[in-house]
Amino acid sequence: MSTKAVRSIELARELGVKPLEIVKFIEKIRNIQFKKGTTNIKVEPDEIDKIIQHFKKEAKLEKIKEKEEKPVELKKTEEIKELEEKKPITPKIIEEEIKEEEELQLPGRFRREISFEKIEKIKPKPVPTKIPPKKFEPKKWLDIKEQKKVKDKNKKEEPAVTPSTAPRKKSIKIEEGTTVKEFAELIGQKVPDVIKKFMELGYMPTINQPVDIDAAQLVAESFGIKVEFSQTQELDIIEEVEDSPELLQPRPPIVTVMGHVDHGKTSLLDAIRKTKVTEQEAGGITQHIGAYKVTLQGKDITFLDTPGHEAFTALRARGAKVTDIVVLVVAADDGVMPQTIEAINHAKAANVPIVVAVNKIDKPEANPQRVRTQLSDYGVIPEEWGGQNIFVDISAKKRIGIENLLEMIALQAEIMELKANPNKPARGTIIESRLDKGRGPVATVIVQNGTLRIGDAFVAGVTYGKVRAIIDDTGKRINEAPPSTPVEVVGFEEVPQAGDSFTVVEDERIARQIANTRAQKKRLAEMQKAQRLTLQDLYEKIKEGEVKELNLVIKGDVQGSVEALKKAVEDITHPEIKVKVIHTGVGGITESDVNLAATANAIIIGFNVRPETKAQDLAEQLGVDIKLYSIIYEVIDDVKKALQGMLEPEIKERVIGRAEVRAVFKISKIGTVAGCYVLNGTISRASDGVRVIRDNIVVYEGKISSLKRFKEDVREVQAGYECGITIENFNDIKEGDILENYVLEKVPVKGL
């Protein structure tokens, strides 16, 4: 067995096969699908032996086939020889006829006099009269092409068309999403010529970029062609077809857990799944939607955990759209709170039944009856009081009443008779999305109808793609996902918006066409909206007397958090200043974000992300303020305080140095030592802290416990030198991580 990983190209060279064959075989082993055209991938040691055995077997089979075929070939050749001997034609004449060079030199008339059937097949009669002899001289393959062209001309009786001549089309039809290349083919012009025309109009398109309809009309008119615009019938392509009752099969219920912050939603799911989800959340608050599948008494139930803070209204509204049953968690000691009322309104708006879980009944101050009374005021009435809502008293912490709650959920699902057709293309909803460095754009999808399979082409909002991998809630790769299954999908062209519909279509071409159409419609709507806002703002400014605006750029680690943060800050009101979010995005803070903030005089807010080194330097040069947070409450509080002029003297962080981890050493009794190279500034042991940054996302923040150079303890290490660093209570350091060393300084407040 091999102990070392190799590249697929090297292995293919050794086995004498094509690299693509190796890649296809690895796809079968790993149960995944690589991007089209991938030939050079890493082959693990345990896969090498399987590949060698597979291709050796194929080679043996080929040899056996060759042996079996050989005697048949010999018989055929003998038969041919016998036939040739029986022919009345003398061998000498046959040899002269087969020689191509001599035959080509003979005049046409003489060749016809001694021609036999074989010669007539090789050279048809019209050829000698039409083609001059000089065309036979350079290369014989050119003669064949020329002869074919002559034949086509004789058949069609049309003059030859050169590439430079103008097209005969007087009008063409183009659809939304037509690329520059497709447009050039339609009007019969070369792509570079068409791009030049677009550039003259002030557009700078690429070959695969969709054309602007107005610009395309002007370009076509310059070539004497009229353009007719035909809209893509998107609704016809992805229209929902009602399934006949015999095709429908029972599906698991999708249950959304809702409730006020700290009332125990995640703890309830934790009790069901017997895992420690709560401890992993920043500040004990759920930051992203989680989707889990639980099997109870042989039946599956899919749970969605929506964040409980009121800032996550948008997320919870999306959760209500995809759910079948809402479990409303209310703490027995706190009672009904603002977010509880909000959750009730979302569930009622979506016409979803509510099962109430009265949590924390183990506490001395718990009063479950008070909760029932309060909820009845909002139309959620217990069954025992003559209402339609099931109430269950539970304690998620002590696992009291959990089994009873699950039985009630299963009972509610049975009453609803939930069904779907698994034998059709999948449809679903994007629950969460993010940009993964290794896998590209990925999204959590709830499949609501049909079955999602690897290789399916799909549309999701204004983006599209092809399913390359499907990962279930346990992290396992699967081939297909039936209805009511939460999965992570890899294969998006761009990061989709959370809440977008996910629809499988016939092929990638249709998917791209629909996505481009939607993108163009969205772009036009935004342009019109921007124009309306400009006029309104102008009127408001005249009326209110130059109202100031606080412009913000928000970047986060996932789309859901960014949307929630945007809504939260935009809801903050102030009599003199308006809060306006001018840009949002997923991923680290880039130079583009800094330039935008500088132009709009905006502040950048980073939520669980870090700025790139170049972006940080540019921000310092341009004087752009970057604020970094990990908990949403802090962002809201800081913005409110800044608007009210109540900010306390600020303790500002100053980054004094950055180091790159180039090697990792594990030493007993000490832990993990990071072998680092100081990129810039100074790494100091006396600093206030150090951050471990992986792919522009903070994975840990703590203090340096030791700093060494050549086995000697040192106070600091300058840029350009190597050193060994250990971090307090953290051993999960990896090669390529960036260690950011900082100090805290008191800075006079200027306002946010």
UniProtKB/Swiss-Prot annotation:
It is found in: Cytoplasm. Residues 395-397 are annotated as: G5. The keyword Metal-binding does not apply. One of its GO terms (molecular function) is translation initiation factor activity. Signal peptide: none annotated. Residues 148-170 are annotated as: Disordered. Keywords: Cytoplasm, GTP-binding, Initiation factor, Nucleotide-binding, Protein biosynthesis. Belongs to the TRAFAC class translation factor GTPase superfamily. Classic translation factor GTPase family. IF-2 subfamily. GTP binds at residues 259-266, 305-309, 359-362. GO terms for cellular component: cytoplasm; cytosol. Residues 259-266 are annotated as: G1. Residues 305-308 are annotated as: G3. PANTHER family: TR-TYPE G DOMAIN-CONTAINING PROTEIN, TRANSLATION INITIATION FACTOR IF-2-RELATED. Residues 250-419 form the tr-type G domain. Residues 284-288 are annotated as: G2. Residues 148-159 have a biased composition (Basic and acidic residues). The keyword Protein biosynthesis applies. This is Translation initiation factor IF-2. PROSITE patterns: G_TR_2, IF2. InterPro entries: EF-G-like_DII (IPR053905), EFTu-like_2 (IPR004161), IF2_II (IPR044145), IF2_N (IPR006847), P-loop_NTPase (IPR027417), Small_GTP-bd (IPR005225), T_Tr_GTP-bd_dom (IPR000795), TF_IF2_bacterial-like (IPR000178). One of the essential components for the initiation of protein synthesis. Protects formylmethionyl-tRNA from spontaneous hydrolysis and promotes its binding to the 30S ribosomal subunits. Also involved in the hydrolysis of GTP during the formation of the 70S ribosomal complex.
